[in-house]
Structure formats: C-alpha cells, structure tokens
Amino acid sequence: MKKYLALALIAPLLISCSTTKKGDTYNEAWVKDTNGFDILMGQFAHNIENIWGFKEVVIAGPKDYVKYTDQYQTRSHINFDDGTITIETIAGTEPAAHLRRAIIKTLLMGDDPSSVDLYSDVDDITISKEPFLYGQVVDNTGQPIRWEGRASNFADYLLKNRLKSRSNGLRIIYSVTINMVPNHLDKRAHKYLGMVRQASRKYGVDESLILAIMQTESSFNPYAVSRSDALGLMQVVQNTAGKDVFRSQGKSGTPSRSFLFDPASNIDTGTAYLAMLNNVYLGGIDNPTSRRYAVITAYNGGAGSVLRVFSNDKIQAANIINTMTPGDVYQTLTTRHPSAESRRYLYKVNTAQKSYRRR
C-alpha cells in the first residue's frame, strides 16, 4: 500500500532535493544545517505536491523504494513488503515513453544506494550488469530479467497489456504495476547471507537474529531510509547506534551516509550494535533468552527504555529481570513497554527469528 504522507511527515526524510549533479546533492554539512534542511524540505515537498497533488505524495521509506525523475513527473515505487513495483507518470506528452524508460531502468538498476539520491529528480539510476531485482521479477514469459533487450520487450508488453490511468482531479496519472515473484523476500535475503555470516562470526551474534532484524527493519531493502534518518538494511542511525559502534572501535565521529548505505558496512555496524547491547548495555541480564528479548526491544527503542520498564535504576532493573522467567520478560516487554512500536517490534523480530532458525 502506498504511503500518502502529510508534509509534516516529509521533513525528517529529506536529504537532498537538488536537481543538479549528484556531487552537489550530498553535501552533508549543508544537510545538517537547519536552515539548509528547511530549504531542501520545502523544495522537495513543493515539487511533489504541486505536480502530483497532496494525496499523491509518495516518498521513500524503510520498505519502500521511491525514485522521481523527469522533473518529478515520473516515479518508480517498489514496495518490498507487498512485493509490487509501480511505475507512474503524470507527463502530459508521450507518457508511454516516460513509463517505458522508467520500467527498464528500475528493472535493471544496481544495488548501490549510495549512488542514488531518492530525494531529487536527478536521473542517477544506472543500468547494471547485475540488476538488484534479478530473480525477484520475471517477464511475461516467466524469465528473469538481466539484459536491456529483455527488459525493453517486457516494458512494451506491460504498456500494451497492463497500462492503467486515473485522475488526481487535475491531471491523468498513467501507471503500470509489476508483481514480484512469491519468494522475493528470500531472494533478497540470499544476497546478503555471506555478509551476515561474516558479521555473525566477528561479533558472536546469531545469524538468525541478524536476518530477523533485517527483515523487520527493511525487508532487505538496501535503499531503506526512515523518518528518524535510519539508513540501510539494518536501519542504523548515524548519531546514535552508528556513533556508539564507531566509539567502541576506536573511531572518531559518526559513520557517513555512504558508509551505511553500503550493505556490508551496514550489516557489520548493525551487528556490532547488537553485540554492544548484548554484552555491554544489557550484559547484566543472566538468562540468554531474556537478554535476547531485551536486546531486540532495545535495538528499536534503546536499552534505557527497556530497563525502565522494570525499574528506573538500571542495576535494579537487571536484578528484577533475573528473577523472572523468559516468558514473563517477553510478556512484560510486549505489554508494558511505553512504545507501541517497540512492543510490536519484539513480536515481529522474535517471530521472524523462529522462521530463520528452522531453515
């Protein structure tokens, strides 16, 4: 389902809205400046709403890839939860040509998020010899799509047989929707198994937990972003988890956006943070299962909020947890944690981890 967001929700997501070259859009010092951020937010929001209409504002999220091109008149939206790819255009002239170009580029794009600015209309999508969606989508003949010729033929088929249109009250929106293969989630997960195993061995974190976190955070979307500016597959926030991990590794500052958009670096950093939660912040919890529940919840809402569920005193909180059964700890965290998101998060990750343990 599309994300229709009010402008108030757009602001925290915007990183760059410049329509200039890519090198000009990722000036991180500029983005950190409040006034600069406001200008970028206003430009992006104004461009989208003015062209598409207020109820048609669709932006990227943890499980949604959204890329605008053609002066914001064309967009590609991959919903990694639903397994759908929707290509839309509001172009008044030759809409089929705009759709065709976007379909081909989306099907053949690579998996390097650091090279793509999701918050501008810069056409920075490059066709890759190893498309990110390869194996996750098949054409009308049931074949996976790797080369431009097959992608072009499939685009022509879609435009002839699946083209739809609707009105936003002012303009006609033309669209094509592609369903991904039923096991698209497993296809994406498989891409990162080697990186997950390496991080698991390095930090002593169970592979199944890493995979469960990745599934819950991003549905294995390497382009994932969020309103809290969490980035990448494991949704690492630069100034909190990222900074903590860097400090523990003797590094100064915080990881860059390009660093966290690199899948291997993101998985390494996210796993390192899980290890810190397990061994440092929540190391006073004796039972490994109880500690795992606490770590999962803390990955979403912080270790402090987990401990405060039991006591405002951190040491006392750990002591209380150590008197409880793992089942009681789970029940407490899923019913008494102040954040509804964190309560649901523990359930989701724990359920996902069980499925990965069975494989």
UniProtKB/Swiss-Prot annotation:
Q: Which family does it belong to?
A: Belongs to the transglycosylase Slt family.
Q: Which organism is it from?
A: Shigella flexneri serotype 5b (strain 8401)
Any one annotated GO CC term: cell outer membrane
Q: Does the keyword Signal apply?
A: yes
User: PANTHER family this protein is in?
Assistant: MEMBRANE-BOUND LYTIC MUREIN TRANSGLYCOSYLASE C, SOLUBLE LYTIC MUREIN TRANSGLYCOSYLASE-RELATED
Entry EC no(s): 4.2.2.n1
Q: What is the enzyme's class at the highest EC level?
A: lyase
**Name the UniProt record assigns to this protein:** Membrane-bound lytic murein transglycosylase C
What cystine pairs are annotated?
none
- Which Gene Ontology BP terms does the record give? cell wall macromolecule catabolic process; cell wall organization; peptidoglycan metabolic process
Q: Which HAMAP family match?
A: MltC
